[in-house]
Amino acid sequence: MRVLLKFLLDCDPDAAWRALQSPTAFREVALPWLDFQPDGDTSFPTVWGGGEHRVRVRALGAFTVGTQAIRLDTLRPAGEAEHATRILRDSGGGTGGVLSALPHLDHRMAIAPDPAGPDADGRLRTLYRDQLIVRAGALTPLAWYTLWAFWQWRGHRLRRLAPTWAYDPPAASVTEELDEPGRTEETA
């Protein structure tokens, strides 16, 4: 069974793409219903890399419901019309506890520029599409309803957090800083 989301995010596609690759944003969109912690003695990287990441999943901040493998890779559609689309795919699944009932998940998150173009203020927004395919045998209908409800929460949180993902330009160079009145190399 599938869970689908499709909406616009109030941030540019590059900011949305960075957020999808951030363990911090991953946790923020799930809170307070679920929280994720690294499984083992490691800490989350600043940015997800490809490969597998194991996590412990806590519900309502109170109890661990299981462990999950997050297996990430990035995809690009082959068609010219979708050239600007970037896709992050998680092909992991539950590995322990209640989550072991969901051993195979296929989760794809697609980021593309808003097809309508920039808004009246010249800001480009992001078309976000999310697809989760759930296979849990006889438990699939129950898993689908639970995940559908949680996905609605994720969608709400994504839309709410997106404006905070704005791109921060690189720090000014020392030369630019020295151009400020009253600044010298000694005070820089």
Short names for language-model regions:
Residues R2-L4, V65-R71, L102-R108:
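Short, surface-exposed coil-to-beta transition loops
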